[in-house]
Every structure is written in structure tokens, then in C-alpha cells.
A protein has these predicted regions:
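Positively charged n-region of N-terminal signal peptides that target proteins for export
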Residues: 1-6
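Boundary at the C-terminal end of the N-terminal hydrophobic targeting segment
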Residues: 22-24
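Post-HExxH zinc-binding segment in Zn-dependent metallohydrolases
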Residues: 171-223
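Acidic/His-rich structured neighborhood in mature extracellular/periplasmic domains
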Residues: 37-47, 52-60, 64-189
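Pan-zinc metallopeptidase signature
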Residues: 214-240
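Bacterial N-terminal signal peptides
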Residues: 7-17
Length: 240
């Protein structure tokens, strides 16, 4: 985790610092939930909307307001931490978030409906969230994970943070910091050379190394009591 922490420290140097006071204030704040503004030109699927520091967060009518309240705390904290230029990059590149209701699947999201044509993988079983890219700057997450339902298959993790970390990386940082991916690659290569992240998701590529690292930084990653991993996780799940 030391190597990925170094990269996260780089992000912090860019302005991504943690403010516990701000987080405390966010918990007392309540988001304004409305219908999506017409200016977003969203699919009629979307009935609920809130704005978090310029980032639209939307869902169908099925997602309860309580989920928006919980999501607001997370996304407000994450976006408050970002340097202004990274947040501006996210907003300028059209970053958005969608929350899937408990009984909605990935392919119910209009922007991800095309994945139903993938004959190699059932995306409704595979994913309860996807990260954004410049081509598709939409990050998705799920009601049951945000509200920590017992039925959440990712109950030990915060997938909203993981997927939005992808969006911060791909849509916010990479377009304005050309050397950032090189730093990630060096950090991942060094970790793998030291025998770390074998047989874990974080070792897949720089994208997952970053997103899993951000999860661990915020202490919202899963832990498996195996140094050699189980294919997804090992004993590394905090910034320590």
C-alpha cells in the first residue's frame, strides 16, 4: 500500500486533502432533490436529481431520498477535497453519477443499456457500479451499497467511492496531468516487483490500482486474511 499511498499523496499535493470539519458539516446538510433540469437532456428514465459541486447525481423514481442524502455526504466530501482544476475538469467534461435502485440492473441505466448485447458477460450480475471515462463520463453505484443493506454483495466496501475514483482519475486528473498515469504505472510496477498485489484486483492495471487504493485510503475496502490474496483482496485494506 505504500506505493499507491505515494501516488495518492501526489493527488493530495494537487489539492486532494481531507477535511474532517467539512465532512461534519456535510452530515448536517441536506441535498436539494428535484427533477433533472432539461438542460442535461437526460433520458426519461431519470426522475430524481441533485447537484453536488457541479456534478449531477441522478436516478429513476425508485431510489429513495434517504439514499440521495447518504450519497450527498460521500460525493460532497470527495468533490470538496479536489483541487479546483480537477473539479473543473470533471464538470467541463460532463462527469455525472447515476444511482441504481436495489432492483435495477446495470443495463437498466440508459447509458449502459448497450452492455446487454455483450454475449461474453452478464453485466447485471457482474457489476453494481461502473466508473466514468472521457468517452462515457458516467459513474454508477447502487442503492443497497450506499445504504448498507444486508443483501449488498459488496457489504464490506464502498463501491460509490471506488467507481467515482475511476471518474476522478479518467475524467478529472488524467486530462490535465499528462504524467499522472506514468506515476501510477511506476508505483504499480514497483509494488508488483516487491511481490505485492499478486492475485488481487488492485494488481490488474493502473485504473484498478488507483481505485482500490482510494478505497483503502478512506478505509472502505474489504479485507481477506490471506497475504497472497483471493483474486480480489488480501490483508491490505487501509492506508497503513
Amino acid at each position: 500500500m505504500k506505493n499507491v499511498c505515494k501516488v495518492i499523496f501526489l493527488a493530495i499535493a494537487l489539492g486532494m486533502g481531507v477535511s474532517m470539519c467539512a465532512q461534519s458539516n456535510q452530515e448536517s446538510e441536506k441535498p436539494v432533490i428535484t427533477s433533472p433540469p432539461k438542460s442535461l437532456n437526460l433520458d426519461p428514465f431519470y426522475k430524481k436529481y441533485m447537484n453536488v459541486n457541479g456534478i449531477p447525481v441522478c436516478s429513476s423514481w425508485r431510489v429513495p431520498d434517504s439514499c440521495f442524502h447518504a450519497a450527498y455526504i460521500t460525493f460532497k466530501a470527495l468533490t470538496d477535497m479536489l483541487p479546483k482544476k480537477v473539479l473543473k475538469s470533471l464538470v467541463d467534461n460532463g462527469a455525472r453519477v447515476t444511482i441504481m435502485a436495489r432492483y435495477e440492473g446495470t443495463t437498466d441505466v440508459p447509458e449502459h443499456a448497450y452492455l446487454a448485447n455483450d454475449t461474453t458477460l452478464n453485466w447485471d450480475l457482474r457489476a453494481r457500479g461502473l466508473g466514468g471515462t472521457l468517452r462515457m463520463p458516467l459513474s454508477s453505484c447502487a442503492e443497497e451499497n450506499i445504504l448498507a443493506y444486508q443483501i449488498d454483495k459488496y457489504h464490506a466496501e464502498n463501491i460509490a467511492i471506488h467507481e467515482f475514483a475511476h471518474t476522478i482519475h479518467n475524467v478529472g486528473i488524467a486530462p490535465i496531468e499528462p504524467g499522472f498515469n506514468d506515476e501510477l504505472r511506476k508505483a504499480l510496477d514497483a509494488a508488483l516487483a516487491e511481490g505485492k498485489y499478486k492475485n488481487v484486483y488492485a494488481g490488474t492495471n493502473i485504473q484498478e490500482y488507483w481505485a482500490e487504493g482510494v478505497q483503502s485510503w478512506f478505509n472502505v475496502n474489504a479485507e481477506v486474511d490471506k497475504d497472497y490474496g483471493d483474486g480480489k483482496h488480501n490483508m491490505v485494506n487501509t492506508r497503513e
